[in-house]
């Protein structure tokens, strides 16, 4: 499981939300 802040970081970097 990935922490929420990490998910948001991935979202920000990949621009896929």
UniProtKB/Swiss-Prot annotation:
Main subcellular localisation: secreted
Gene Ontology CC entries for this record: extracellular region
Organism encoding this protein: Rana temporaria
Function as written in the Swiss-Prot or TrEMBL entry: Antimicrobial peptide.
Disulfide-linked positions: 11-17
Coiled coil, from the record: none
Organism placement in taxonomy: Eukaryota, Metazoa, Chordata, Craniata, Vertebrata
Family membership noted in the UniProt record: Belongs to the frog skin active peptide (FSAP) family. Brevinin subfamily.
Protein name: Brevinin 1Tc
Protein location: Secreted
Free-text tissue specificity from the UniProt record: Expressed by the skin glands.
Key words, A-Z: Amphibian defense peptide, Antibiotic, Antimicrobial, Disulfide bond, Immunity, Innate immunity, Secreted
